Amino acid sequence: MALALSDVKRIAHLARIEISDDEAAQTLAQLNNFFSLVEQMQAVDTSGIEPLAHPLSAVRDMVQRLREDVVTESDRRADYQRPAPATEDGLYLVPKVIE
């Protein structure tokens, strides 16, 4: 897959990004290089290769040490909401800005 300069300009227009011709040309080259790399990776035969559960498992047999999932901070909602001008049921009340 390869993009044309018109594709880059159209994408920039749709994203509401102002782009010069030089920037569009540079972006086109970068995107086409990226798509070329993706095509090369997709061309590699990976049948019979087991997917990795984690990138480190390819390098060495390593167990990832994870900490226990415990609460480390107390609930301080009331402390944080005390200086607020208006709260209700744990939520901050703000003025309506959209009709």
UniProtKB/Swiss-Prot annotation:
Transmembrane segments: none annotated. It catalyses: L-glutamyl-tRNA(Gln) + L-glutamine + ATP + H2O = L-glutaminyl-tRNA(Gln) + L-glutamate + ADP + phosphate + H(+); L-aspartyl-tRNA(Asn) + L-glutamine + ATP + H2O = L-asparaginyl-tRNA(Asn) + L-glutamate + ADP + phosphate + 2 H(+). Keywords: ATP-binding, Ligase, Nucleotide-binding, Protein biosynthesis. InterPro entries: Asp/Glu-ADT_sf_sub_c, GatC. GO terms for biological process: glutaminyl-tRNAGln biosynthesis via transamidation; regulation of translational fidelity; translation. GO terms for molecular function: asparaginyl-tRNA synthase (glutamine-hydrolyzing) activity; ATP binding; glutaminyl-tRNA synthase (glutamine-hydrolyzing) activity. Its EC number is 6.3.5.-. Allows the formation of correctly charged Asn-tRNA(Asn) or Gln-tRNA(Gln) through the transamidation of misacylated Asp-tRNA(Asn) or Glu-tRNA(Gln) in organisms which lack either or both of asparaginyl-tRNA or glutaminyl-tRNA synthetases. The reaction takes place in the presence of glutamine and ATP through an activated phospho-Asp-tRNA(Asn) or phospho-Glu-tRNA(Gln). Belongs to the GatC family. Heterotrimer of A, B and C subunits. This is Aspartyl/glutamyl-tRNA(Asn/Gln) amidotransferase subunit C. It comes from Cupriavidus necator (strain ATCC 17699 / DSM 428 / KCTC 22496 / NCIMB 10442 / H16 / Stanier 337). The lineage of its organism: Bacteria, Pseudomonadati, Pseudomonadota, Betaproteobacteria, Burkholderiales.
